[in-house]
Amino acid sequence: LSDFLLSKYKVSNKNYREYSKLTNKRALPVGPFMKNHPSLLSDDYSANATWQQAKDYCQWLGKESGKKIDLPTEAQWEYAARSRGQYLPFATNNGELLPGENFPNQDELDSYTDGIGLPFYPLGKFPPNPLGLYDMGLSGSEWTNDWYAADYYSHSPVNDPQGPAQGTKKVLRGNVGGDRQYALTMFRQSDLPVPKISKDDDYEKYGVGPQYVFRCVVNK
């Protein structure tokens, strides 16, 4: 991979609210789930966004700073999560997932999420991975720039793979609860760029769930 710098933290609610004010964008819709669990809207939790909203934020940051900033490719994300491509099952300080040490235990998750116990918590609460990146693969699924195809890496370029040229779903990486496999550094997921939260698919009513989060990359 060509040189890149991945953000130390995911984009926070505070970051995104400031961006919305500076760009005169509407605030993100807040659905019933988030209203019932207002801790998730606190300044130091990850911002929840559609794929395009996440990409727009990163590219705006690039325009303002004069740098090439975007969503990371899936390959960049995994390389960083695995601390330069090492075999590390989890992107924690030691490659293991240890509740109460480098990931919240159940009591902590309850306190962070108004009693619901889902795996979302404030940014930077636990040790980073060896590259200094916090919460990689944890506390939500992170958008990447790539379209998803199950067989993409069987024929992808060796250098700087960018994902398929087109598709219907975008690649996500990270844990949203349930089986720990979702937090594995090599586990692939995908979803529609505007995720369907409910059967009537009303984004203005439901927004997006707390699992759709992101961080940005600076490309050299």
Protein language model features and the residues they cover:
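Short, P/G- and charge-enriched loop/turn segments at secondary-structure junctions
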Residues: P130, V194-K205
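Conserved aromatic-histidine-acidic binding/catalytic patches
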Residues: D3-F4, K8, S42-S46, E204
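Functional-site microenvironments in short loops/helix caps that host divalent-cation chemistry
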Residues: L40-Y45, W51-V194, P210
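Short, structured beta-strand segments at or near domain termini in extracellular proteins/domains
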Residues: K205-K220
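Feature responds to low-complexity, polar/acidic, surface-exposed segments characteristic
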Residues: L28-S42
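A short glycine-rich, aromatic-capped structural motif
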Residues: L1-G31, T50, L138
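Residues within well-ordered beta-strands of beta-sheet-rich folds
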Residues: L5-S7, W60, T144, R215-V217
